[in-house]
From Swiss-Prot:
Pfam families for this protein: HrcA
InterPro entries, A to Z: GAF-like_dom_sf, HrcA, HrcA_C, WH-like_DNA-bd_sf, WH_DNA-bd_sf, WHTH_transcript_rep_HrcA_IDD
Function: Negative regulator of class I heat shock genes (grpE-dnaK-dnaJ and groELS operons). Prevents heat-shock induction of these operons.
Organism: Clostridium perfringens (strain ATCC 13124 / DSM 756 / JCM 1290 / NCIMB 6125 / NCTC 8237 / Type A)
Molecular function (Gene Ontology), one example: DNA binding
Protein's name according to its UniProt entry: Heat-inducible transcription repressor HrcA
Length: 339
């Protein structure tokens, strides 16, 4: 059991280390923080905190730094969210574009760029493969006498446009009718569910327009095919170099290789809808043992769709980063609510 004085000292050490990046000694805490105890008492408490696993001593320093366990206690029991400035709040509101006017993937990419800019961390987006998306609607529009623009909209808001060639393009009224029938027959199906029976039924429903059906379906397949695993993309990879923890060329190379390994990155990120913070030893990928990862889910309508995460060293300003992440995800999910 950790008492209140130890908690106060641990909080002071973590806040000082986050601010300076330098190991913290008892004299520093005694001078900078009004804790009402002597340097000797603080030194003894720090020794106890180290024995309890909340502090570590770097080999080359007499000072102490927080361990993963220390950061975890700080995040769980001591953190106070930093109030965002009016400029930051305004930037968040203005940067997440109107969800009724743009594709979901564009909104997510813009949001990841915003998070990377505000936190100075690397942002990771884990989204389900388009391969797993459901058809929401298909609209056919005349381009010329032998060309039709096929506009596919999926349930997660992704829009794909493909031009198909046919013998002769029907009049607009017929195209509207064909679009409606195709949408009715394919709605809420994934590419894997569009089997021979579905195709046969569609051809019967659109007798006389088989050439259009036979052109639309391959176009649909091309739009939705792809890797069956989650899609992962990064924003702000260069932000890693903002931290002295990665001044060491070996560590920098290791983290960059990790960031470009999509399978490993996908395993790093929690699929929980809730805000999740993983620190150091809680991360089961060896190359990320000295990192922190903050992640949260995003939704389209009522459907949980993907995860946005921030990755950096253990020494980050949790108060500020969690405030930014909370506000951005709130704004994002509100924007996507009616998609």
């Amino acid at each position: 059991m950790i008492d209140d004085r130890k908690l106060q000292i641990l909080r002071a050490i973590i806040q000082d280390y986050i601010s300076t990046g330098e190991p913290v000694g008892s004299r520093t805490i005694a001078k900078k923080y009004n804790l009402g105890v002597s340097s000797a008492t603080i030194r003894n408490e720090m020794a106890d905190l180290e024995d309890m696993g909340f502090l570590e001593q770097p080999h080359t320093s007499a000072g102490r730094i927080p361990s993963s366990r220390g950061y975890r206690l700080y995040v769980d029991r001591m953190i106070e969210f930093e109030r965002l400035s009016s400029e930051e709040e305004g930037l968040i509101r203005s940067s997440i574009i109107d969800g009724t006017l743009y594709e979901v993937d564009k909104i997510i990419k813009q949001t990841s760029a915003l998070l990377s800019e505000l936190t100075k961390m690397t942002c990771i987006v884990k989204a389900p493969s388009v391969h797993k998306s459901f058809v929401k609607s298909i609209q056919l529009l005349k381009v010329d006498d032998v060309s039709i623009l096929c506009v596919l909209v999926t349930d997660n808001g992704v829009i794909r446009n493909t031009v198909i060639k046919v013998k002769s393009v029907p009049i607009s009224e017929e195209l509207i009718k064909i679009s409606k029938i195709i949408t009715e027959r394919l709605k809420n199906l994934t590419i894997e569910q569009i089997n021979l029976e579905v195709i046969s039924n569609l051809n019967r429903a659109l007798s006389g327009y088989e050439d259009i059906v036979n052109a639309v379906l391959p176009a649909l397949y091309e739009s939705l095919k792809g890797d069956e695993t989650s899609e992962v993309f990064l924003e702000g990879t260069i932000n890693i170099f903002n931290y002295p923890e990665y001044n060491n060329i070996h560590k920098a190379k290791e983290i960059l290789e990790l960031l470009h390994d999509k399978k490993s990155i996908s395993e790093l990120i929690s699929d929980s809808d809730d805000m999740t913070v993983k620190i150091g030893d809680e991360i089961f990928v060896p190359e990320a043992k000295e990192c922190s990862i903050i992640s949260a889910g995003y939704h389209v309508g009522d459907r949980s769709l993907g995860t946005i995460a921030l990755i950096g060293p253990r020494r980050i300003n949790y108060s500020k980063v969690l405030s930014i992440m909370t506000e951005v995800m709130k704004e994002l999910n509100e924007t996507l609510k009616n998609k």
